[in-house]
UniProtKB/Swiss-Prot annotation:
Catalytic activities: UDP-N-acetyl-alpha-D-muramate + L-alanine + ATP = UDP-N-acetyl-alpha-D-muramoyl-L-alanine + ADP + phosphate + H(+)
Subcellular location: Cytoplasm
NCBIfam families in the record: murC
Name by which UniProt lists this protein: UDP-N-acetylmuramate--L-alanine ligase
Main location: cytoplasm
Family: Belongs to the MurCDEF family.
Naturally occurring in which organism (per UniProt): Glaesserella parasuis serovar 5 (strain SH0165)
Function: Cell wall formation.
Superkingdom of origin: Bacteria
EC number, UniProt record: 6.3.2.8
InterPro entries: Mur-like_cat_sf, Mur_ligase_C, Mur_ligase_C_dom_sf, Mur_ligase_cen, Mur_ligase_N, MurCDEF_pg_biosynth, UDP-N-AcMur_Ala_ligase_MurC
Length: 475
């Protein structure tokens, strides 16, 4: 422990040439986590975001200087600027930093510096990485290891998305969206799945994306460990190319850590994990869905391979409350047509939406599933249009909101009205397009029935809309 602390002190001393670290997009989940860890390490932190919120307010209260809006003068005093992947070269703070010859780096480059003298565990994949990161963090915490963790979403059990621990362990979500996870040099890497997403980063070439994952895994030292999902065809395709020890997990009979007998009752999942030694471990989860069983088994595999006792693993998983905006129950409400349950979920890729619907069907077999879906980005809607049409046709009733642009310009044929038309033509559900979100509650009241499960689905502001709706329904 002393040797590790001496190394960290050396790194901090070397970085003391950095007087102030400025984050552009400090309110983002990944950015705020790194800012919080560095703030707790004693650095001066400043940052800007386009909107105020709970995250920016928490950072300001902790001592960060937070600006709302992007302006050149915000970087005054900064020794380095960290920019999120959503920030482009035309941003006034980026331009001002470059003019002043202040280094501008990616989020993952700063995360790599934090990881440099630590035992890094990096979790990557198209889906499930936030929840898996949270689960591993809670297992290591339960084991008394006090890890540092940086997650892309709220770890509900901890009440935050980042923590500066006293031990050598650093558990971090790795971002493939801009390929910046290649900066990381972990000891253990997890890959949950690989599917086409953020394809602009990879020039629309899925083969290039797969090769980038191989490069990420080859960043492991020769004695490192790759924990990979046996159920994902693409993950297993690249596994032989990694050149490092690979441990697999999943429902597949070929998995090293194999899931058996999964059952779900409401929010609870029960199943057995058969370990490589033949040991059988009974798991209780308080988060629903087979996808969460996969996430938990990835976390279990990491912990078992690193020598953590079963007691800590089982206790952490049984107590796990979920990650923020992952099948997040907002409450049950009495409406004019009966009692309904409202759930908020971040899933915005067809596969994520699909597993959320399946979790709802499996846990609440006799309920209608009513979805309020907000597509996220025109480019994603265009690239995965047919998949969205098929997946969204599985619900009993569908309200479609306008595409949340996330800074993108509209793309012809990739708007919500286009999705609605194609879903309607499929003939399974008749979607309702709600362009004025102030009418959402009224429209819902017209279509919901007693016992309905309402899923507010998407990565944009649909979460705020659903939470505002929940507050109004409580009144």
């Amino acid at each position: 422990m002393k040797n590790f602390q001496d190394k960290v002190k050396k790194l901090v001393a070397e970085m003391r040439r950095v007087n102030q670290i400025h984050f552009i997009g400090i309110g983002g989940a990944g950015m705020s986590g790194i800012a919080e860890v560095l703030l707790n390490e004693g650095y001066q932190i400043s940052g800007s975001d386009i909107a105020d919120g709970a995250v920016t307010q928490r950072l300001a209260k902790a001592g960060a200087k937070v600006f709302i809006g992007h302006q050149a003068e915000n970087i005054e005093g900064a020794s380095v600027v960290v920019a999120s992947s959503a920030i482009n070269e035309s941003n006034p703070e980026v331009a001002a930093a470059k003019e002043a010859r202040i280094p501008v780096i990616q989020r993952a480059q700063m995360l790599a510096e934090i990881m440099r003298f630590r035992h890094g565990i990096a979790i990557a994949g198209t889906h499930g990485k936030t929840t898996t990161t949270a689960m591993i963090s809670m297992i290591y915490t339960e084991a008394g290891l006090d890890p540092t963790f940086v997650n892309g979403g709220l770890v509900k059990s901890a009440g935050k998305n980042a923590h500066l621990g006293a031990s050598r362990y650093l558990i971090a979500e790795a971002d493939e969206s801009d390929a910046s996870f290649l900066h990381l040099q972990p000891m253990v890497s997890v890959v949950t799945n690989i599917e086409p997403d953020h394809m602009d980063t990879y020039g629309g070439d899925f083969e290039k994306m797969k090769e980038t994952y191989v490069r990420f895994l080859r960043n492991l030292p020769f004695y490192g460990l790759a924990v990979m999902c046996a159920d994902d065809e693409t993950v297993m395709e690249i596994a032989p190319k990694v050149g490092r020890q690979v441990i697999s997990y999943g429902f597949s009979e070929k998995a090293d850590y194999r899931i058996e007998d999964y059952q779900q009752t409401g929010f609870q999942g029960h199943y057995t994990v058969v370990c490589p030694t033949g040991e059988r471990i009974e798991i209780l989860l308080n988060v629903p869905g087979r996808h969460n069983a996969l996430n938990a088994t990835a976390a279990l595999a990491v912990a078992k391979e690193e020598g953590i006792a079963n007691e800590a693993i089982l206790a952490a998983l049984a107590d796990f409350q979920g990650a923020g905006r992952r099948f997040d129950q907002l409450g049950s409400f009495i409406r004019p047509n009966g009692k309904v349950m409202l759930v908020d979920d971040y899933g915005h890729h067809p596969t994520e939406v699909d597993v959320t619907i399946k979790a709802a069907r499996q846990g609440w077999e006799n309920k209608r599933v009513v979805m309020v879906f907000q597509p996220h980005r025109y480019s994603r809607t265009r690239d995965l249009f047919d998949d969205f049409v098929q997946v969204l046709s599985q619900v009993d009733a569908l309200i479609m909101l306008n595409v949340y642009a996330a800074g993108e310009a509209p793309i012809v044929g990739a708007e919500s009205k286009d999705l609605c038309r194609s879903i309607r033509n499929l003939g399974k559900v008749d979607p309702i397009l709600v362009s004025d979100t102030s009418q959402l509650g009224e429209v819902l009241d017209q279509i919901i029935q007693d016992g309905d499960l309402i899923l507010a689905q998407g990565a944009g502001n649909v979460s705020k809309l659903s939470r505002d709706l929940a507050e109004s329904w409580k009144a």
